[in-house]
Amino acid sequence: MYRSMAILSSLRHAYSQISTRSYLSRSKVGFSSNLSSPLDSFAIVPSRFLWKFRTFSSKPDSMLQLVLENDWSKEVEEGLRKPDMSLTHETAIYVLRKLEKYPEKAYYFLDWVLRDSGLSPSTPLYSIMLRILVQQRSMKRFWMTLREMKQGGFYLDEDTYKTIYGELSKEKSKADAVAVAHFYERMLKENAMSVVAGEVSAVVTKGDWSCEVERELQEMKLVLSDNFVIRVLKELREHPLKALAFFHWVGGGGSSSGYQHSTVTYNAALRVLARPNSVAEFWSVVDEMKTAGYDMDLDTYIKVSRQFQKSRMMAETVKLYEYMMDGPFKPSIQDCSLLLRYLSGSPNPDLDLVFRVSRKYESTGKSLSKAVYDGIHRSLTSVGRFDEAEEITKAMRNAGYEPDNITYSQLVFGLCKAKRLEEARGVLDQMEAQGCFPDIKTWTILIQGHCKNNELDKALACFANMLEKGFDIDSNLLDVLIDGFVIHNKFEGASIFLMEMVKNANVKPWQSTYKLLIDKLLKIKKSEEALDLLQMMKKQNYPAYAEAFDGYLAKFGTLEDAKKFLDVLSSKDSPSFAAYFHVIEAFYREGRLTDAKNLLFICPHHFKTHPKISELFGAAA
């Protein structure tokens, strides 16, 4: 209670116009809770929300189920050998991806695949296994698999290496990270295949595809294999159309080697072609590989979907999802909910795409999870379709899921986006009435909605109300409120507010929050306040945001200002050479040669003979 009182006092000090009345009033927009029965409520939901359920199985799922539900044994291996369990490379990829949380089962399964199934090893199979073992910290088996991979003539590709290295660099696995880095560097030096792949890439990329390019490639007398073709495609990933030309040349008899593409190389080509300027070619190769009897594997789907999403290719992402759901290697419910979240994150979600995803998932006969319901609801509220959002909520309830803070927060967000702020505030009262108490995220969304709609006074009133409910401010909410001050050009008020929150609420602002506010304060020449924030940054163990001050001091600061700045940057003894040099250099570049030399005069003696100082001023310095 004492902390809340202190914070409220700080709030009034930072922004004197806070209204004392509560702006949280009841509203008609929200969720109904007085449903008479599930059947009655279901009757009012439009047909597109009537989810049907039926059983579904496939050979890949049967194989996965066998491995998941049993300890590894000879009986499991015999079951995997049954005629109705025919194994393909795509099926092996699918099962491994689904076993990501079960490293021991994944390890035994891959061992059986490579030892006893008759399926040829491949870089993608090894890569997935390595990622699983690292994520689950099964390091003994990781190193065994990596050595086996190398002995078999396969390579650790760059993407897999980066994923593994990034995972191992966390916390207590840094020794393994260093060892993997050494392994990768040594592999690159020892592997002659990568050198030849680089030479092929150089030939292909130097101009348009032509008879001359084909002649040069023929003269190289390439030894073609799946592994080599994958290497070249990786080298050509920034030139997808040229990669496709090479792909068709090696597989179409142009190389005169008799080489035929496999599912591994088709999938590798798809990963390269999944870009805005080659999407037509991507779908052409999808059709081509289907005709050849191959399928897109689950690992390729996940990576291509991410590429499409990164490029904001929403329609292609949904088309890809539909394609996979029609095949044997269906994405998981988590993939569906993540896709809906991606679609709802657009400024104006395309509801046609949203419902295409949900209908396609529904067509498999599986029941929708709460995450999927929330994904649909999020898009509807984002575009202001609140009546239909309410229908989804009723369907969710009928399926056994109660609205929670996620669901309500989406409604609050949509109402704020639609500038229906009073109704948004009323949702929080409704939540409490229905026994679902708003959490800090819900309050933050409400407060941010007011800030974005230029209603800082009401945002701060909501904040005060939140404190009275017993919540403490966190870094995210502090950033939201500082943005609200900044939108109103209340930079000094923001600075006071931030410093009081650090003092009274024991909150640690984000580094980006400090940087934003320092930039704004320097913009209005409030260097003293900016220095106070810089000093606070240092106390909270952030790197000092010094670069913002260098240019400011050179244009507007005095020599005394520069000294104060350097004092703030000082550690136990004195500021570093870099701190002194950047300010001296800024003065020099601004034409303030006298001030630059005066600052140099007071810096430690050994700094004056530093090569950079000599280079800046000349030997006479």
From Swiss-Prot:
Cellular component, GO annotation: chloroplast; mitochondrion
Presence of the UniProt keyword Transit peptide in the record: yes
Residue spans of the PPR repeats: 122-156, 157-194, 262-296, 297-331, 332-368, 369-403, 404-438, 439-473, 474-509, 510-544
Subcellular location per the Swiss-Prot or TrEMBL entry: Plastid, Chloroplast
Domain of life per record: Eukaryota
Alphabetic keyword roster: Chloroplast, Plastid, Repeat, Transit peptide
Span of chain positions assigned to the transit peptide in the UniProt entry: 1-67
Example GO BP: RNA splicing
Gene3D superfamilies, A to Z: Tetratricopeptide repeat domain (1.25.40.10)
Protein family membership: Belongs to the PPR family. P subfamily.
Protein name as annotated: Pentatricopeptide repeat-containing protein At3g48250, chloroplastic
Organism in which the protein naturally occurs: Arabidopsis thaliana
